[in-house]
Amino acid sequence: HLTMPLSRHTGQIPESTWTLGFREMTEPWKGAVGCLGVAVFFAMTIGIISWQALEQPPEEWVLRGRDAGMLWERGRGALLLRALPAGRPVLAIAVGSVPATEPPPPRDRCWHDGRQFCYSWEEDAELRLSLEPPAAPGTECYGVRWTPLRPDVTLKDCFSMANVSWYGGPSIRAQRWPLNGAQSPAQPLVSGDLSANPDGFGPLLERYFLGSTGVTVTVAPDVSLLLSLESHRQFCLETPAGRAEPLHYQLCVSADCPPRSPKHLTRDFPTCRSPIWRYHGPEGSAAKIKRGLRSLVRRLKRHRLQEGVVALGERGTAVLAAADLVPSGRRKRQAPELVEPLELSITLSPYAGVTSPLFLRSLRGGEAAGYWLSRQPRPGASSIPLLTTWKGQLCARLNVTSEAALGWYLARARRLRQVLGATYVAFEGVEGNSFLEQDVPVPAELEGDGYTEALAAALATLGNGTVISAGSRSSHLPLFVQMSPLRSDWSHAGLKGLIPSVLHYSLLGYNFFIPDAVGGSEAGATPGDPELFVRWLQIVTFLPVMAFGTPPWLCCDTWVLNLTRQCIQRHRDFVVPLLLKYSEEWQSLGYPIFRPAWWLSPMDPVAFTIEDEFLIGDEVLVAPITEKGQTWRDIYLPGQGHLWLDTNTARVFDGGTTLRNYSASLAEVPVFVK
């Protein structure tokens, strides 16, 4: 059986009353000491963490080249590009596809390759930076490639406008120079028709951006891309949502600020007589058109303006073509007689109305089913033309991926040119992606601006008397590009947008362009304003071609008519030789013919934002009035150390200075020669 253990005497002194009281008094002190210890522990931990954080710099080099390098900035999560050896800031890219709070990449997965840096945010995206072969002498280039690791990741990189002026990219409705002042929501970086979509991108577009710090950003044509412009903050490149596509582009940094590396070179350049007189007479029948053309030419002769080109629009061309295209050879060329001694320009487009004889005839042949863009057919089904809208009509659009379709279309254009006796053929509607506009899957060869690029290459085979309405990766072709219509007012959608457009086109390699008609061709706030007409005329005098929609005798007084004659003569005698001279330089060096003020003052921040002056080559500065009612303006003379002669007053001024309140009456345009 179990027995209870016997208690034993331990020899301890029994606790007295004062001992118990002392223990009760010391208990709170023990608790306080414990709390103090915990507090000290936490303080030490926080101190160690803070010390580590302070010891680590806010920026960490991730890839260095010879002349520049890339860093990762903690906190906001940004890639930085800096020039060496001084570390001059060149570019800041805010990264929107990975957590900004994540520390800088601690591990380089490409550590074995000194020309690359790789890091992966395991749940979001992978980044790969690489040193690339230089795009031009004196430059250093970096490839940036983001790859999404989940289907729902949208890659987005934003390029800061802080202390950087940006140029290039797309044309827009109210063109700005630089594009820092532009605003646009995120939308596909594809050319478009501004008349149909004023908030979209315009017909001239390159995936090329140039910064005043000496940096360029170039995106490959096969990258699906959206662009947003946030005025005076940043512009952003991002991939379409839900498609898990990579985002990659190239950064190049140059010692030149901004860089002046050549773009596209060509061995040939187009020719176009000036001025162009646009026909806006009756178009109801071939007989009415011919009478209208004769009447226009008679008036031009009467006013001693009998030179240049008479331009017939698409509708007038179609009416004449229907009357003059007869099966037999009985009908002789009659159209040249209509406009002699001027030349004739006709207008075509890659569209055909679904009820038009052209479209219906094209469907008769066996091959003709492939002449038009079509939706991808289901297995076993026949293709259906992708119908779109052009000038308010339901139309089909030429299939530029079909050699048979292009051959048929070009043969028709040549036949029309011959029968109508035209010297020039203008093509409208070259811009845009019809599949993208209708949210239809795009064939791989027509991604982005593939349509514009393919059609431009085909049209260039017609010769250098060809004009197209858009440009994308086609600046190397001997084609004239028709600028977008402008409003008849003084805004950036009107007169103030003309010089920014000139600089934009020329910078991207499109030096041979036809500006909108003098005074603007879209209704604006001041239609028929003689002052607007004159100030517009003074600018286009110095451009490749002078174009008129409203003849001067209809809009203005006799003195404006006389001024028009003087401007046409000045264009022929002074401007055309300059353009020929600098077109040779463009072909050999790739430098634009029309240059911004910063071209001669690349280190002066004042020059970066001047949008109402332009240079022809390095020797002529044009500084017109673009404000209503003004007869004076401030003029920046670029090029410190140069001397500029005012052609109106014969006064000489130093370059690198600003002339304040310089006088220019309505009959004058300030022009300086170096």
Where are these regions (language model features)?
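Catalytic and substrate-binding clefts that recognize carbohydrates or anionic sugar/phosphate headgroups
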Residues: 53-274, 283-286, 297-302, 600, ...
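Generic recognition of flexible, low-complexity loop/linker segments
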Residues: 194-197, 204-206, 296-301, 332-335, ...
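Aromatic- and carboxylate-enriched substrate-binding clefts and catalytic-loop regions
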Residues: 305-568, 598-602
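Short, glycine-/Ser/Thr-/acidic-enriched flexible segments
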Residues: 215, 222-224, 316-317, 351, ...
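Membrane-embedded alpha-helices of multi-pass membrane proteins, especially ion channels
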Residues: 43-53
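Conserved structural-core and active-site-/substrate-pathway-adjacent residues in large, well-folded domains
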Residues: 208, 300, 337-339, 409, ...
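Carbohydrate-binding surfaces of carbohydrate-active enzymes
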Residues: 26, 30-39, 43, 303-304, ...
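Short, low-complexity, Lys/Arg-enriched N-terminal segments of secretory-pathway carbohydrate enzymes
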Residues: 1-29
